[in-house]
Amino acid sequence: MSGIMKSSLFFTKKVGSYSDGWGEVTGEDRTWEQSYRDRWAHDKIVRSTHGVNCTGSCSWQVYVKDGIVVWETQETDYPPTPAGVPNHEPRGCPRGASYSWYLYSASRVKHPLIRAELKAAWEDARKTMKPIEAWASIVENPQLRKSYTAARGLGGMVRTTWDEALEIIASANLYTIKKYGPDRISGFSPIPGYSMVSYGAGTRYLSLIGGALLSFYDWYCDLPPSSPQTWGEQTDVPESEAWYYSSYIIVWGTNISMTRSPDAHFLTEARYNGTKVVNVCPDYCEVTKDADWWIHPKQATDAALAMAVSHVIFKEFHYEHPDPYFTEYCRKLTDFPILVTMEPRADGRYTAGRTVRACDLGYKEPECNNPEWKTVVWDELSKAPAVAQGSMGYRWGQKEGQDLGKWNLHEVDGETGKAIKPQLTFLNDSDAVIDVEYPYFGGRERDGFPNNAMASDVMVRRVPAKRVQLNGQDVYVATVFDLFGSYLGVDRGLGGECAKSYADNIPFTPAWQEKITGVEAQYAITLAREFATAASKTQGRACVLMGAGVNQWFQTDNTYRSIINILLMCGTCGVPGGGWCHYVGQEKIRPEAGWSEYSFAKDWEPASRHMNSTSYFYEHTDQWRYERIPLSDMLSPLANTKVFDGTYVDYNIQSELMGWLPSAPQLNVNPTKIAAAAKAAASSRNNS
């Protein structure tokens, strides 16, 4: 009798009883359970991760049966964290737990596809020609070439074999190298944060043939340009365990609970530990439920809120009641003490120029190494300019007995060896108080910001300055700290245009930002006070989690830097549980030395060709033709409009020509033919 028939025989199941007949023992058929055992049976367990479009790098146990992935579970053998700190596990998410479904999805491309028109042309050409000749006959025939290029975007892809696909690719590459040069071949390889080996396979191939490697981190706006602008380094941020050490966390423009699922538990655990969590985001996103306070500015107005927070912190924690920890941090570890030249204008006012450098004090090569790259501070001890260690000039080109070991922040004059104490402000010992002009880009009403109009495109602020002699001329200089405070409109008793109270509608006050962001002025004041107070009491253990919500928006560099200003004023960067925490993508990998040797073919050649993808696609896909914001809107009202009268693409190309942006190709000829041309030219000169 079958199992199905047996299950229908209700009265024959009883085989006994117990508890004086109150309970009975039945005979049930359990063969159906085998189907479940077969479903979860496996031959082996493989450790892996889910590297496609995810940089979480979570460790998973992948169960394999007959070569097929049948299911997966999270691994739990991560190294333990310090005592009292939650462990990293469980790491994983529902997307990872169902990843085997992606592998065998009907929508996944599992074989090469080619346009039907190109396949027909190729097969016809290969009947009589070798591979490279066949490709040349197609691309050099206008009608044949148009037959498949005109079909782009219209579908019509058909299946081909791997052998045919590889032959076409190799033939096209060899043809291009022979006729135009290897630097005319460019390629993009998936980011190493997904799979180091997969990325390296593509870049190694391009490096070996002399092609141009397209960048990844900057192209899709995962790279925060504010980081190299501020520190000269690319996204050096803490890992998620550090959140637990924080006393105050602002989640600003990143949806941690959704986009960083493996790390999100640290945020919740930190909150249980007493950390206050504030979410700054226009929409009620997932992370809002994990926060204590939701602040929702209008989209694209984050910088205004951040500047108002900076205004409050500078006024209360740096001017009215200077916090000792903040003062020492800013003096030793930021650019606040660095001197800036004040450039006179025709109207008798000044603008901030460049930083004062060692070369301005008379230091020259070879006695002084890199004098144009060493910044200058004002020394409180000697009451004179000093060349503080730690600037870029001390990092590059160190020489034995000269700059060796001086790339640090010890309070020493790098050129004289004397102890120094960089001075933050000239407020109490200035030689003069000068009027400084700053550009104000909110001086005109714009769509979406109807209440942002002020009286002028130029702000005039009073700044304390010192008169020093640079290159034989008397020049006014000011510290970055004094310039920043005046720019924020903080009233420091110098008179002029500044905010007497937070209610004044002057740029960067809480009242000013309220008209732009929609966030109540009192909220901005409270946020500033709470964050700074937490940072003060914990010596910098307060942080801001940032991400794509802000970074992938127009003017991201300015928005990010307005937030970074808050972090630096509160002495948080470099402190466990403090600083800026940018989480978009993943540009770092652990075995970088060996990986780069493999990926960029350094075992064959010392350097590869690189091209920044942002410029590449902006120019070659004609995106520059669709700019809707004229360059004049981006230009400072203090700038010379006659000098800057082009378009965005003009200045992008100019940056490439000057070497500010990596670019390839760099020559207008085939580089493989340069040597032969040079020999021919030399031979002709010798014969003549």
Identify the role of each PLM range.
Residues M1-P324, E328-Q473, D482, S486-G493, ...:
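N-terminal export/assembly segments and adjacent metallocofactor-ligating motifs
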Residues K515:
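Active-site-adjacent helical/loop segments in soluble small-molecule enzymes
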Residues R492, N505, A511, Y523, ...:
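A glycine-rich, hydrophobic/aromatic-adjacent loop/helix-cap motif
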Residues S57-S59, T275, Q539-A542, N687:
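Active-site lining segments that contact anionic ligands and/or coordinate catalytic metals
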Residues G489-A499, A503:
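Amphipathic, charged-and-aliphatic alpha-helical interface segments
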Residues Y180-P190, D218-Y220, H321-Y329, G496-K500, ...:
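Short coil/turn segments at secondary-structure boundaries
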